[in-house]
């Protein structure tokens, strides 16, 4: 169903909807949004950057003024908006742009100020990974008045290809603690500052990453029993690429429920929907050389802003410099491959699975991914699989449920309450 566009660019409109969609959880103010949108030119990364940097500085100033006056909630809200606006201000740049890291650090700094003003405790966690690398996240804990019976259920919330742990707060990090859940907003390899600053790429076998995270929480629960984390009620969640990661993580038996929002089945198959089929088949079969593919894609990207941006993110996320190498690496990001077999047959926990019923307007489609995944979750009983395929934008018809996060959160926690036997009184 048609909706009002904020920009003549579909990509810009999608990302603007993403920003405005965080308003219900404190990530945006309508007046600030309108002011920024009026200054953004189609496919102009500089005007996008300037508009959101201006709003970030404005919100940061408001937050500092409120903090100096002792106004906790206004200060918290403005720091949250500043964090989101500084994140947005760097978004249309490629990761090689020198301004990306400083803007990202400013986003993190503002979120850190907001974190100290939350109703419940928000802990910055550092999780030991491989080769001396540390994964970071924000553990958002419920305030006392929001506690449910028993220990706190825990959600491991993984980002996708372009989210940050600070932006993740605006979905489950905001709603979960209000409903008694502890929520970890996590940046894994190839995400956030690990990609932008440390140049560490994504890895397809996210169950390995999840294993380190679960081990960390096992130790944390022992060293901090006062946190009352329930390791028998751990869920994993993610959207788009994060939805793929959630399904991979759900192969770990310690995960008791999975929320996969609009995941892809295969990154390679998804890429094929965005390129000339015949040309890609010729390349895959060796009839087109790598240098020809690279030249073709480079030329296409020079004349298409969205394609150029996506290609740049794809190459940096995969840790490669050439389009051909990126596409080959995409084949590893699949829920079925030669190395790991049929991954979905190792998932046994309940799964809440969603798709964009509007079709593949951005990165996935219900037919190519969601329904295929549903059918291949053979070890999950039918009554433990819940599917949601909205089509209208207001209902979550856009990829990753952009613009409908409050509704997504409601449906997610209805599902998790059912699986974790959380009892509540009707209002």
Swiss-Prot record:
The protein's enzyme class: hydrolase
Pathway: Mycotoxin biosynthesis
UniProt-annotated catalytic positions: 368
Keywords: Hydrolase, Virulence
Keyword Transport: no
The protein's Enzyme Commission number: 3.7.1.-
GO molecular function: hydrolase activity
GO biological process per UniProt: antibiotic biosynthetic process; monocarboxylic acid biosynthetic process
Protein task: Alpha/beta hydrolase; part of the gene cluster that mediates the biosynthesis of GKK1032, fungal natural products containing a macrocyclic para-cyclophane connected to a decahydrofluorene ring system that show potent antitumor activities. Within the pathway, gkaG catalyzes the Knoevenagel condensation that affords the 3-pyrrolin-2-one ring, using as substrate the polyketide-tyrosyl acyl thioester product of gkaA.
Assembly: Homodimer.
Family affiliation: Belongs to the AB hydrolase superfamily.
Protein name according to UniProt: Alpha/beta hydrolase gkaG
Organism listed in the record: Penicillium citrinum
């Amino acid at each position: 169903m048609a909706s009002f566009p904020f920009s003549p660019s579909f990509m810009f409109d999608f990302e603007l909807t993403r920003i405005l969609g965080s308003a219900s959880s404190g990530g945006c103010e309508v007046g600030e949004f309108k002011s920024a949108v009026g200054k953004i030119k189609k496919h102009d990364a500089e005007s996008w950057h300037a508009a959101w940097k201006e709003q970030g500085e404005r919100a940061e100033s408001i937050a500092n003024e409120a903090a100096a006056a002792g106004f906790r909630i206004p200060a918290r809200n403005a720091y949250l908006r500043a964090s989101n606006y500084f994140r947005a201000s760097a978004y249309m740049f490629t990761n090689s742009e020198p301004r990306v890291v400083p803007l990202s650090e400013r986003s993190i700094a503002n979120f850190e100020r907001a974190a100290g003003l939350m109703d419940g405790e928000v802990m910055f966690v550092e999780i030991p990974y491989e080769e001396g690398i540390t994964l970071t996240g924000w553990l958002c804990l419920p305030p006392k008045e929001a506690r449910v019976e028993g220990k706190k259920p825990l959600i491991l919330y993984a980002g996708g290809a372009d989210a940050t742990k600070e932006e993740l707060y605006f979905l489950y990090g905001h709603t979960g603690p209000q409903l008694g859940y502890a929520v970890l907003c996590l940046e894994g390899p190839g995400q956030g500052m690990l990609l932008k600053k440390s140049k560490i790429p994504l890895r397809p076998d996210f169950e390995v990453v999840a294993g380190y995270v679960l081990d960390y929480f096992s130790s944390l629960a022992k060293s901090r029993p006062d946190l009352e984390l329930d390791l028998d009620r751990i869920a994993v969640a993610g959207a788009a690429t994060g939805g793929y990661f959630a399904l991979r993580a759900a192969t770990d038996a310690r995960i008791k429920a999975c929320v996969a929002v609009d995941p892809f089945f295969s990154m390679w198959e998804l890429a094929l929907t965005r390129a000339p089929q015949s040309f890609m088949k010729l390349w895959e079969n060796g009839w087109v050389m790598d240098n020809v593919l690279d030249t073709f894609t480079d030329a296409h990207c020079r004349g298409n802003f969205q394609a150029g941006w996506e290609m740049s993110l794809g190459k940096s996320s995969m840790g490669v410099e050439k389009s051909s190498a990126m596409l080959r690496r995409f084949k590893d990001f699949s829920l079925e491959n030669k190395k790991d077999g049929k991954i979905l047959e190792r998932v046994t926990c309940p799964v809440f699975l969603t798709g964009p019923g509007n079709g593949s307007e951005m990165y996935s489609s219900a037919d190519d991914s969601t329904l295929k995944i549903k059918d291949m979750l053979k070890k999950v009983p039918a009554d433990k699989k819940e599917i949601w395929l909205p089509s209208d934008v207001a209902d979550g018809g856009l990829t990753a449920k952009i613009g409908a996060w409050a509704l997504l959160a409601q449906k997610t926690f209805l599902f998790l309450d059912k699986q974790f036997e959380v009892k509540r009184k009707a209002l």
